[in-house]
Design a protein with these regions (language model features):
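Glycine/charged-rich beta-loop-alpha catalytic/anionic-binding loops adjacent to active sites
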Residues: 110-122, 205-209, 336, 368-372
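A non-catalytic alpha/beta surface segment that caps or lines the substrate-entry region
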Residues: 39-86
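Acidic/histidine-rich catalytic neighborhood of metal-dependent amide-processing enzymes
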Residues: 119-195, 237, 243, 254-255, ...
Length: 404
């Protein structure tokens, strides 16, 4: 594959303030990407479109084996761009290619500066807005020969399926040790802190019986689960901690006392101690509920029981306000007369995983709103502002390399 080194900066563009993104081009690319179906584990079509885009811009591109590992039809797309400022820090720019359901045959509708759908699907601005911004920034850098260091672009798969694309990424193959994920809905904030999360699956075992003839000979697993859930602290636990039971599966028929039910849950916290406490609290509530449900019949004792599977979903993100990437973004915002604040979020994203892998990555907003719903919309003015800020961050990094 052809490898293009982005040319030296023009002297007239040293300050970079007169270099603007092409709003029309960015808007059109975003709409094009939105129309490409890309549910988790089915990102092949958009990956091929982005592969062509990256190669046209001169990157060395490859696709890793994450798709094989997670049962998808394509892996993470990685593109390496060679810069023209060898002393500048290599930067990572990343966004995810997949969308949540319902996300097929999306019809984007433009009303002034607001992009939304026909109400039958999500928009897919999460996270195709981030993908489009990265493409536009790289094109502006190339076309204007702006100063920049090496840039590693990572378009991940399966972010919406538990960040598994990022988890499968070999970060050792990247040159960049710091950078940005573009995957947030709150404009004016750079997210530098995010919680760790535990994922839980509880299988509650009861005893089946005929619900009409002899219900007293059964132990309802659903009733046991309900008893345990009723004792749990869920939702907003405190300013650092949340918990949720999101899936309940069980039962075979209305005339059978159910002998099994599965609960799928999560807990999140910015505090490891609180995360451990909340996780054990949820487990204990179910185990204590099971202990209260005992049946003696035919000379035997039957007791409800709980099987628990608990695993770390992702570690917390905690990037210092003094980190180089934070300082760069804040300097870029100041140059553009934009107010931006560092902020903690309750959500997890690929940045959590990248930081866990030893990188220093923050999460920047893109203008998306009401994500994961059919009411999702995006403000193009915020999209353009975010793109301009990323462009200025890249330019500053190349124009003012770190002092050795």
């Amino acid at each position: 594959m052809r490898k293009l080194v982005i040319g030296a900066a023009r002297q007239t563009d040293t300050l970079g303030f007169n270099i603007l993104i092409n709003q029309e081009r960015l808007k059109n690319l975003l709409i094009e990407l939105i129309k490409i179906d890309s549910l988790s584990r089915r990102e092949y079509d958009i990956a091929m479109r982005l592969k062509r885009e990256m190669e046209e811009l001169g990157a060395t591109v490859w696709i890793d084996d994450a798709g094989e590992k997670v049962g998808g039809n394509v892996g993470n797309l990685i593109a390496n761009f060679s810069g023209n400022a060898p002393s500048a820090r290599p930067l990572l720019l990343s966004a995810h290619m997949d969308t949540v359901v319902p996300g097929e045959r999306i019809v984007p509708l433009l009303d002034g500066d607001i992009l939304r759908t026909d109400g039958k699907t999500v928009l897919g601005g999460d996270d195709k807005s981030g993908v489009a911004i990265i493409c536009e920034v790289l094109r502006v850098v190339k076309d204007n020969r702006l100063p920049c260091g090496d840039i590693d672009v990572v378009f991940t798969i399966c972010e919406e399926a538990g960040l598994v694309g990022a988890k499968c990424l070999d970060a050792g193959r990247l040159r960049a040790r710091t950078g940005l994920v573009l995957d947030s809905d709150s404009v004016g904030f750079l997210f530098t802190k995010a919680p760790a999360a535990n994922r839980m699956e509880f299988r509650v075992h009861g005893l089946e019986a005929h619900a009409g003839v002899c219900p007293e000979k059964g132990i309802s697993a659903i009733k046991v689960a309900a008893d345990g859930i009723a004792q749990m602290k869920l939702g907003r636990i405190d300013h650092e901690t949340t918990a949720n039971i999101g899936v309940i599966e069980g039962g075979m028929a209305v005339n059978i006392v159910p002998n099994s039910v599965i609960l799928k849950a999560e807990a999140r916290s910015h505090s490891q101690e609180k995360l451990d406490q909340q996780t054990q609290h949820m487990r204990r509530c179910l185990e204590e509920a099971a202990a209260r449900h005992e049946l003696r019949a035919d000379g035997k004792v039957f007791r409800a029981r709980v099987e628990a599977k608990i695993e770390r979903d992702y570690d917390r993100m905690n990037v210092s306000d003094q980190a180089p990437i934070v300082q760069l973004v804040q300097a870029a915002a100041e140059n553009l007369n934009i107010e931006i604040k560092t902020q903690a979020t309750g959500g997890g994203c690929d940045a959590n995983v990248f930081n866990q892998k030893g990188l220093e990555v923050a999460n920047l907003s893109t203008g998306m709103r009401d994500i994961h719903t059919v009411n999702e919309w995006l403000d193009l003015k915020d999209l353009y502002l975010s793109a301009q800020m990323v462009l200025e961050t890249v330019r500053l990094n190349g124009a003012h390399p770190p002092v050795a």
